[in-house]
């Protein structure tokens, strides 16, 4: 969790390592997206599950979801709302992966629902 994997490890398991990122990528990459979202005054926050590549937070996207937030939400509230969204997104991504419903084409995915 919150670790950057070596290129060697990623190469050994292409499209088999899933990352959950706590923002609706490509917005707010990096380690503190909820803080960045709060500072920008966003109206929605989200989560993205994607396959890990050597480029940080840039792998093929498997699943995404968003939740509406309001101007009075604190950073702590954004984190809590976001964590709830992350659970849903990660569980769907794992399910699709295990059921072999994900086709990777270059840096995009096709999901067979």
What is the predicted role of each segment?
Residues 1-113:
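Donor/substrate-binding cores of folate-linked one-carbon enzymes
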């Amino acid at each position: 969790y919150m670790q950057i994997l070596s290129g060697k490890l990623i190469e050994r398991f292409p499209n088999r390592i899933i990352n959950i990122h706590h923002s609706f990528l490509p917005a707010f990459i990096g380690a503190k997206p909820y803080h960045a979202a709060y500072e920008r005054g966003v109206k929605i926050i989200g989560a993205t599950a994607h396959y890990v590549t050597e480029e940080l937070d840039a792998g093929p996207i498997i699943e995404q979801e968003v939740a509406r937030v309001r101007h009075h939400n604190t950073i702590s509230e954004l984190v809590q709302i976001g964590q709830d969204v992350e659970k849903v997104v990660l569980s769907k991504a794992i399910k699709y992966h295990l059921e072999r419903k994900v086709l990777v084409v270059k840096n995009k995915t096709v999901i067979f629902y």
